[in-house]
């Protein structure tokens, strides 16, 4: 029996022999990808501030990274669909991120940094959506088990944030680009184990506009837009805000980790909550808690 040939085909939960290897390969990507994000989100704005970038410049740099999400995932998704080489898109995106970010420690000026972040995030945003597709194709009908794999991303984020809070306190915030490079390297290595996934879904031929104007789709898009809009200042300036209010990097790491710990608890329970409460109700509740979160901050 050739296990490697079929490792990402069908439903891994129906194949106990292949479960461990598939689970490890999928989970390791999420772990290292979000560990990279754990190094980036809380500490990159602090690093930019340390390098004497202004609040305006930090906002533009952070906004550039988020802005590429509008175009990059759609373009890379189209390439993956046309070529059928989704795993190669993931690997190419991860390697490109690593190579581009190698220049980050040498950049001191605003415009070169914006340019670097633009190209970095253009490839960064290529990997995760395509890997999500690989994961869902691997799970097949057991898509409700997705959270058990995805929670490893949250664990990676927490460990990264907490470990770097210690190292930045000891060695200074200037080590952050090198820490990000380390996690980007591990992310790329994890993509080398991604195999070509068999897409068992049958796509219906519909125009994009026809799909978007559906009330349910339009409602989700508007809700997600507003949620992302509310997170923009948080991602860019929250760590700086805490620093200016005399919080240590150790405490900043703990504060960032608290939200992700809650995320892990949700991932552990969500597969049983969906059939019990319904997606719509869970969606509404999550927005209520998000609103409460901003009010408390």
For each of these PLM feature ranges, what is it?
Residues 117-152:
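Cytoplasmic helix-loop-helix junction between adjacent transmembrane helices
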Residues 71-105:
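Conserved MFS/SLC helix-loop-helix module at the cytosolic interface between two early adjacent transmembrane helices
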Residues 88-102, 281-296:
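Structural signature of the two symmetry-related core transmembrane helices
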Residues 8-20, 191-228:
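Juxtamembrane intracellular "pre-TM" segments in multi-pass secondary transporters
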Residues 175-192:
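Symmetry-related core transmembrane helices of the 12-TM Major Facilitator Superfamily/SLC fold
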Residues 31, 100, 110-128, 225, ...:
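Hydrophobic core of transmembrane alpha-helices in multi-pass small-molecule transporters
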Residues 71-85, 168-169, 265-278:
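Helix-to-loop junctions at the C-terminal end of transmembrane segments
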Residues 13-66, 217-255:
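Helix-loop boundary and gating motifs at the non-cytosolic
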């Amino acid at each position: 029996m050739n296990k490697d040939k079929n490792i990402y085909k069908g439903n891994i939960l129906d194949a106990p022999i292949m479960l461990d290897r598939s689970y490890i390969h999928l989970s390791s990507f999420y772990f290292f990808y979000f560990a990279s994000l754990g190094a980036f989100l809380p500490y990159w704005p602090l690093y930019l501030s340390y390098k004497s970038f202004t609040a305006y410049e930090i906002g533009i740099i952070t906004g550039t990274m988020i802005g590429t999400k509008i175009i990059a995932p759609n373009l890379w998704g189209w390439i993956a669909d046309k070529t059928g080489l989704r795993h190669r898109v993931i690997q190419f995106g991860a390697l490109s991120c690593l190579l581009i970010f190698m220049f980050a420690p040498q950049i001191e000026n605003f415009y070169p940094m914006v340019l670097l972040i633009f190209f970095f995030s253009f490839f960064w945003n290529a990997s995760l959506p395509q890997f999500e597709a690989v994961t869902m194709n691997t799970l097949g009908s057991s898509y409700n088990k997705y959270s058990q794999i995805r929670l490893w991303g949250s664990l990676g984020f927490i460990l990264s944030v907490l470990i770097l809070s210690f190292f930045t306190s000891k060695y200074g915030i200037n080590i952050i680009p090198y820490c990000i490079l380390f996690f980007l390297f591990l992310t790329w290595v994890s993509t080398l184990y991604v195999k070509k996934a068999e897409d068992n879904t049958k796509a219906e031929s519909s125009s994009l506009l026809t799909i978007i104007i559906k009330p349910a789709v339009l409602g989700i898009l508007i809700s997600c837009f507003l949620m992302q809009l509310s997170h923009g200042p948080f991602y860019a300036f929250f760590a700086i805000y805490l620093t200016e209010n005399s919080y240590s990097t150790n405490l900043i790491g703990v504060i960032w980790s608290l939200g992700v710990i809650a995320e892990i608890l949700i991932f552990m329970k969500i597969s049983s909550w969906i059939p019990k409460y319904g997606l719509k109700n869970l969606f509404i509740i999550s927005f209520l808690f998000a609103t409460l979160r901003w009010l408390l901050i």
